[in-house]
Curated annotation (Swiss-Prot):
The keyword Cytoplasm does not apply. This is Blue copper protein. Disulfide bonds join 78-106. Residues 127-160 have a biased composition (Low complexity). Residues 127-165 are annotated as: Disordered. Transmembrane segments: none annotated. Glycans are attached at residue 163. The keyword Signal applies.
Amino acid sequence: MAFSNALVLCFLLAIINMALPSLATVYTVGDTSGWVIGGDYSTWASDKTFAVGDSLVFNYGAGAHTVDEVKESDYKSCTSGNSISTDSTGATTIPLKKAGKHYFICGVPGHSTGGMKLSIKVKASSGSSAAPSATPSSSGKGSPSSDDTPAATTTTTTPTKQNESSATSLSPIVALFFTVSWICSYVLV
């Protein structure tokens, strides 16, 4: 009986360890509209809290736009010549690996000045419930940042079909809850 309980406990811990990394949120920039000229990305970001471990997915026409992560000064001036990273494949995923301000623009001339720019503040941990911060994309004015060079890597993914929400994080929590409940009821019975 002790061996059986130990085995169930090990299984429970393995399930929890596999589920925890999946609790990060994947945000589709612009929701169903995607990364387009004329999008209001300041409003889009205003009700979201970004945390280290989350990801941004930019969906756009391959070759028609780019996603460039830039420094704050390049964000304000809509300059992509010194981009930290750039991608133009049509489906760009940016993992948020570092806390602080992150700035994104479309590097195609005229697109950033037409509204294709996004500024977000990434929190160190997803456990906090403080309000999100976003710099308005139309004014180009933002508060100074002590960290002008956010570290991020650009990877590409195949676009995924999004339903009503741009963020996905509830189902892993629900799955974890039911798995733990089932295992606990098995151990206690």
